[in-house]
Amino acid sequence: MFGKTLKTIPKVIHTGRTRLRAERTRFAAVRAAVANGADLIELGIPFSDPTAEGPVIQGANIRALSGGVTTDKIFDLVRDLRTDITVPMVFMTYANVVFSYGIERFCKRAAEVGMDGMILPDVPFEEKEEFAFVAEKYGLDLISLIAPTSHERISMIAKEAEGFVYCVSSLGVTGMRSQITTDIGAMVELVKAQKDIPCAVGFGISTPEQAKKMAAQADGVIVGSAIVKLCETHGADCVPYIKEYVKSMKDAIR
């Protein structure tokens, strides 16, 4: 579904302010990312205990929940974005969010509004089937995360991967890092040996130089905390900064 053009995936976590100005900013931020080269959008549904996230995105989750963001409001956002946004979109959230909404109800609604898949970082490979079965029923991909681990485990996860593989660049939580030392090329080779599927690298990528290096070894890069930080720093005025940032990342990997 995600094809071979996958390169830049911005992660957008919304702050949850309910004023009209903030609503417009959220729409504009996503559209700015797409207009400046994003091949896929990852939308976060906030959760009170986002264990895979570093302080920047944890803070965004807290602000979103405090501001009244709900799963249904995120679905409404996606429905409105789909009037003109055609690139793939996936959710990043946690198992309890889906459980509390109801797995069947969540997947059905996600498909209805135009989502393409979801990432559940706290669901281990061995426990994914109850989500994957329902997701497949509604045409959604449950995206697999592969962290630096044994060759056997990477191969096992890769065989059943759908959509694209989220290659975790570093152990730990999300957040900007000064350097990435994991041998991403070797990880991607192991995945490709099992299945012809796009591989995107995330966790820690924040500079054009890092993006260029990672994109040379994989099919795409996932940028999260750096974009969320722009939203946090500039608030309703963040859109031009997102435009400039996404363009710089895209230009680095063309």
Predicted regions and their residues:
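Active-site-adjacent beta->alpha loops and helix N-cap segments on the catalytic face
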Residues: 2-8, 48-57, 69-79, 99-105, ...
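Glycine-enriched alpha-helix->loop->beta-strand junction motifs that scaffold or abut catalytic
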Residues: 37-39, 110-116, 135-142, 159-167, ...
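Catalytic cores of alpha/beta
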Residues: 23-33, 149-159, 201, 205-221
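N-terminal amphipathic alpha-helix/helix-capping segment at the start of soluble metabolic enzymes
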Residues: 1-16, 79-83, 254
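Conserved, mostly hydrophobic/aromatic
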Residues: 15, 33, 44, 110, ...
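Glycine-rich phosphate-binding active-site loops on the catalytic face of alpha/beta enzymes
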Residues: 39-50, 115-119, 124, 169-175, ...
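Hydrophobic faces of well-ordered beta-strands that scaffold small-molecule active sites
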Residues: 13-17, 41-43, 89-93, 118-120, ...
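Active-site beta->alpha loop and helix N-cap motifs at the rims of alpha/beta catalytic domains
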Residues: 40-41, 45-47, 56-120, 253
